Amino acid sequence: MRRKIVKIKKSYEFKKVYSNGKSVANQFVVMYYMENNLGFNRVGYSVSKKIGKSVVRNRVRRLLHESFRLLDIEIKTGFDIIFVARGKIVEADFHTLKNSMRKLIMKTPLYAGNEK
């Protein structure tokens, strides 16, 4: 059964993860994460105006969200996660982005592997 994805929306929640969390990055995405002790994951997406106009930014946000939704079963619970888009993300297709996000998750303690 799929878990409900709770989004981080408040700026103070983003700042908390940025300042207290750890990060990993690749050419498309920077991922910040920290434990939240809530028993479920919360996710946020940050796509700056440097990426492009609103149509492009919203498309990137949708791609990030869908990739996370599909990878959610591979992630342990109890974390706040923020994905920050980098400039090259505009050139990436969905499968490239999903694989790059999977590799980032596998580098961190978030990866559950075959536990579930």
From Swiss-Prot:
Q: Which GO terms describe its molecular function?
A: 3'-tRNA processing endoribonuclease activity; ribonuclease P activity; tRNA binding
Q: Kindly list any coiled-coil regions of this protein.
A: none
Q: Which GO terms describe its biological process?
A: tRNA 5'-leader removal
UniProt enzyme class: hydrolase
The reaction(s) catalysed by this protein are: Endonucleolytic cleavage of RNA, removing 5'-extranucleotides from tRNA precursor
The record's InterPro entries line, in alphabetical order, gives: Ribosomal_Su5_D2-typ_SF, Ribsml_uS5_D2-typ_fold_subgr, RNase_P
Q: Does Nuclease show up as a keyword for this record?
A: yes
User: According to the lineage, what is the superkingdom?
Assistant: Bacteria
Cellular component per GO, a single term: ribonuclease P complex
Q: Which Pfam families match?
A: Ribonuclease_P
Q: Which UniProt keywords apply?
A: Endonuclease, Hydrolase, Nuclease, RNA-binding, tRNA processing
**Annotated EC:** 3.1.26.5
User: What NCBIfam families does its record include?
Assistant: rnpA (TIGR00188)
**Family to which this protein belongs:** Belongs to the RnpA family.
Which proteins does it associate with, and in what oligomeric form? Answer: Consists of a catalytic RNA component (M1 or rnpB) and a protein subunit.
What does the function comment of this entry state? RNaseP catalyzes the removal of the 5'-leader sequence from pre-tRNA to produce the mature 5'-terminus. It can also cleave other RNA substrates such as 4.5S RNA. The protein component plays an auxiliary but essential role in vivo by binding to the 5'-leader sequence and broadening the substrate specificity of the ribozyme.
Q: Which HAMAP family match?
A: RNase_P
Q: What is this protein called?
A: Ribonuclease P protein component
Q: Which organism is it from?
A: Thermoanaerobacter pseudethanolicus (strain ATCC 33223 / 39E) (Clostridium thermohydrosulfuricum)
Question: Lineage of the source organism?
Answer: Bacteria, Bacillati, Bacillota, Clostridia, Thermoanaerobacterales
